[in-house]
Amino acid sequence: MDSKPYRYISKAINLDLYNELVSEIKPKRELMTVTYSDAKIPERRETAWQTETDISAEYSGKTMDPVPFTPTVHMLKKKIEEIIGVEFDSALIFHYIDGKDSMGYHYDTIGVGRGNHIAGVTFGSSRCLGVRNNETNEKEFFNLGNGDIFYMFDDCQKKYKHAILESKEENPGPRIAITFRQMGPNLSQKN
């Protein structure tokens, strides 16, 4: 059996932190540059960037300046490092307010290349994460619920794309996802 460079860990963190995280982080919806154009459109989700480094997060024509970890995000970083066995120094945070907030199939570039480890944890309502193989277009789907972790590693960003799909539920409720990443040069990892 061919092992895949991603892993789903159900109910890894048994805490209800959605309201606390949104209040503490204060994510915001910004304008993004449309690919192959100078047009700016509102992002389909709210975002925030927290890090122990002095590195900004940049994608789609926007730059997020480095902001230190808030207490709850720092506590979650430590818990995820224990579970995964990899150190992280940054977190790109996504707030999906309703079922229309989504993200199409893509591969990550922020924090990829240095360690290729991204561990995302979800709080709040469930959303469907799709993972698509770049060669075969085969898809796998995961219903990410409160406290679930989705961990991508090795060559995942080269071989697969992933998406948070638009919800078909009438009122799915909000969700926040904290994706821990490696930006700095001095982190350890089990491999």
Swiss-Prot record:
Superkingdom of this protein's organism: Viruses
Location of the Fe2OG dioxygenase domain: 87-184
InterPro entries for the chain: AlkB-like, AlkB-like_sf, ALKBH3, Oxoglu/Fe-dep_dioxygenase_dom
GO molecular function terms listed in the Swiss-Prot or TrEMBL record: dioxygenase activity
UniProt cross-references to Pfam families, sorted A to Z: 2OG-FeII_Oxy_2
GO biological process terms on file: DNA alkylation repair
Coiled-coil ranges from the UniProt annotation: none
PANTHER family membership: ALPHA-KETOGLUTARATE-DEPENDENT DIOXYGENASE ALKB HOMOLOG 3
Protein name: Uncharacterized protein R406
